[in-house]
A protein has these predicted regions:
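Hydrophobic/aromatic-rich alpha-helical bundle segments in the mid-to-C-terminal region
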Residues: 4, 124-130, 144-193
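An amphipathic alpha-helix signature
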Residues: 17, 90, 133-136, 140, ...
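N-terminal intrinsically disordered/low-complexity leader segments
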Residues: 1-11, 193-194
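Short, solvent-exposed amphipathic helices
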Residues: 73-76, 123-134, 138-141
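Hydrophobic alpha-helical connector segments
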Residues: 61, 75-102, 145, 151, ...
Length: 194
């Protein structure tokens, strides 16, 4: 699981975001009340509303932090594991398995947010969608760099494998599902690059 970005350390705002992220991951967004966040963070309600107009605004800020930290961690790990663009397509699944095996794994914050805030116009849903679009764009970049005939198609296929592995992990708690997704990706990548 990615570590908190050093640039965000300190301050009551960051303390609220850090606490909220931890509680949302464990209990969900709607089930986690403001009073619980305040008690865990050791922060007064006035301080919360000084930094955030609403719980939804806190959720969006927490997801923005999670997005930046997660993508930096994930993409950095992929880059370290693979030397070539083609190898990076498969390193995605190595890093996915690494994440699944982490003791702090609590599933996808963004999938959970989208499922709890179903209205696509809601700020929380939009933030979740933005993250998913960023990841799809990353897969598109990897596919194009590897020489895929149709980078958009390969990116969507990779995304489906990743998202499917995440859901499988959520339900069955089998980290090795990342290896199965990797096997499927091998076939798709071979076809896309031929």
């Amino acid at each position: 699981m990615p570590k908190k970005n050093d640039k965000t350390a300190g301050g009551k705002r960051d303390q609220l975001i850090d606490t909220a992220l931890r509680l949302f991951a464990r209990h969900g967004y709607r089930a986690t009340g403001i009073d619980t966040i305040l008690a865990e963070a050791g922060v007064a309600k006035m301080t919360l509303y000084h930094h955030f107009k609403s719980k939804d605004e806190l959720i969006v800020a927490a997801l923005r932090r999670r997005d930046a930290d997660w993508r930096a961690w994930f993409m950095g790990r992929v880059a370290k594991r693979a030397a070539t663009p083609r190898e990076r397509l498969f390193a995605v699944f190595d890093v996915l398995e690494e994440w699944f095996r982490n003791q702090d794994y609590h599933g996808c914050s963004f999938g959970q947010a989208a499922s709890e805030f179903r209205d696509p116009k809601h700020a929380v849903h939009k933030m979740a969608s933005e993250h998913k679009q960023q990841m799809l764009g990353y897969f598109r970049e990897l596919a194009a760099a590897a020489g895929a005939k149709d980078p958009e198609l390969l990116a969507k296929q990779m995304d489906l494998l990743v998202e499917g592995a995440i859901i499988h992990m959520e339900v069955f708690r089998e980290p090795e599902v990342a290896r199965i997704a990797d096997d499927a990706a091998q076939k798709l990548v071979d076809e896309a690059l031929s």
